[in-house]
């Protein structure tokens, strides 16, 4: 014999979503810092310097929603114009810029966190604009005189989404080492990853990327840290679009060259809901509960597609579009430039939720849920 009981269930956000991560210690953001290369140029200035006259290519640059980018342009040739640097010179450029910008971003980040180099216990470096062995982490440790006992990791070649992959790694390290400071450092010398062949394919890439480095300090087990805590990650690789974004060897150009399929903004947008729904699954949260969206500044069309498919407002992505306008696409560290702007804005309140979103080769979408 049974009794039927009428029940009404109301799903509310969990008071402490840290249980979702399965971690006994929750990682919090402790500080952020950014750096760029020495010189910036408007899109018109780049076109004039590179002597680009093709109206279609000029239109790509001038309709990119980018005002300025920090770039280290090719050297001038004796007869005027610019020299197309060989791959060896580009690798040297990457090493010099990535280390310089990375050191400055790291120092700014530690200052923001109220910490010093001697407090650093784990350094995870991210780059895709060049290849280094020993890795960028080793070079920066030597350059800044960081304790050689500092543990380190390098994420290389994952592209624009890699900053969140690194945060996932360092958040796990942080939870296992409460009270110790870890840093995610993204350093991308996009000026070292170009090809000049007059085609529309390379024009799109050359119009988009800029040099930049961003560092994020994290720590667990210290409730005094005011930054948001990391609650959950979600990842999705669109295997049918594996070749839609890639950085590989161009035999005709005798160098590495980046390829972006024209359909990639729509591919990313069409799959954004899948990842967002997985991220919020089991939390009791809806997308409308998210107060702050920090999306990778991948390009005007990519941002527009994400906005439409996730039902966001232009205000939601104001930092994303602002970073694109002022810097261009900074690859793996773009979302941290946006986070820095949000932190400086001072509008977050305790209990607010935020979503970090990056997109890159694979084609890949990464997301993280955070709470202040």
From Swiss-Prot:
Disruption phenotype: Cells lacking this gene are unable to produce balhimycin. It catalyses: 4 malonyl-CoA + 4 H(+) = (3,5-dihydroxyphenyl)acetyl-CoA + 4 CO2 + 3 CoA + H2O. Keywords: Antibiotic biosynthesis, Transferase. Pathway: Antibiotic biosynthesis. One of its GO terms (molecular function) is acyltransferase activity, transferring groups other than amino-acyl groups. Its EC number is 2.3.1.246. Changing residue 160 to A: Reduces the formation of DPA-CoA. Strong decrease of the affinity for malonyl-CoA. Pfam families: Chal_sti_synt_C (PF02797), Chal_sti_synt_N (PF00195). The keyword Membrane does not apply. The keyword Transferase applies. The active site is at 160. Transmembrane segments: none annotated. SUPFAM superfamilies: Thiolase-like. GO terms for biological process: antibiotic biosynthetic process; polyketide biosynthetic process. Changing residue 296 to A: Reduces the formation of DPA-CoA. Belongs to the thiolase-like superfamily. Chalcone/stilbene synthases family. Involved in the biosynthesis of the nonproteinogenic amino acid monomer (S)-3,5-dihydroxyphenylglycine (Dpg) responsible of the production of balhimycin antibiotic. Catalyzes the Claisen condensation of four molecules of malonyl-CoA to yield 3,5-dihydroxyphenylacetyl-CoA (DPA-CoA) and three free coenzyme A (CoA). DpgA requires the presence of the dehydratases DpgB and DpgD to facilitate the aromatization of the DPA-S-DgpA or DPA-S-CoA intermediate. This is 3,5-dihydroxyphenylacetyl-CoA synthase. It comes from Amycolatopsis balhimycina.
């Amino acid at each position: 014999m049974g009794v039927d009981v009428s029940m009404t269930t109301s799903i509310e956000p969990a008071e402490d979503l840290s249980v979702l991560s399965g971690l006994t210690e929750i990682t919090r953001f402790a500080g952020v810092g950014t750096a760029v290369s020495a010189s910036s140029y408007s899109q018109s200035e780049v076109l004039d310097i590179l002597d680009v006259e093709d109206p279609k290519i000029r239109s790509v640059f001038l309709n990119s929603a980018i005002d300025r980018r920090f770039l280290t342009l090719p050297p001038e040739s004796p007869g005027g114009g610019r020299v197309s640097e060989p791959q060896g010179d580009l690798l040297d450029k990457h090493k010099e810029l990535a280390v310089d910008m990375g050191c400055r971003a790291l120092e700014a980040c530690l200052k923001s966190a109220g910490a010093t180099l001697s407090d650093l216990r784990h350094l995870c470096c991210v780059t895709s604009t060049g290849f280094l062995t020993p890795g960028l982490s080793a070079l920066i440790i030597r350059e800044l005189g960081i304790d050689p006992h500092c543990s380190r990791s390098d994420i290389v070649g994952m592209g624009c989404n890699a900053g969140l992959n690194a945060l996932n790694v360092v958040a796990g390290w942080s939870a296992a080492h409460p009270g110790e400071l870890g840093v995610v450092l993204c350093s991308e010398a996009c000026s070292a990853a170009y090809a000049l062949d007059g085609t529309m394919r390379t024009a799109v890439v050359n119009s988009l990327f800029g040099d930049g480095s961003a560092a994020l300090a994290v720590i667990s087990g210290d409730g005094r840290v005011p930054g948001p805590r990391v609650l959950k990650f979600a990842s999705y690789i669109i295997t049918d679009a594996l070749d839609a974004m890639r950085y590989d060897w161009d035999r005709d150009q005798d160098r590495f060259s980046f390829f972006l399929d024209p359909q990639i903004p729509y591919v990313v947008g069409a799959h954004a809901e899948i990842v967002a729904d997985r991220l919020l699954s089991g939390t009791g949260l809806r997308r409308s509960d998210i107060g702050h969206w920090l999306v990778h500044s991948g390009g005007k069309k990519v941002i527009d597609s994400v906005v439409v498919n996730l039902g966001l407002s232009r205000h939601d992505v104001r930092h994303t579009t602002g970073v694109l306008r002022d810097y261009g696409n900074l690859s793996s560290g773009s979302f941290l430039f946006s986070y820095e702007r949000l932190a400086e804005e001072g509008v977050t309140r305790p209990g607010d939720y935020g979503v970090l979103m990056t997109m890159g080769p694979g084609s890949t979408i990464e997301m993280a849920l955070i709470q202040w």
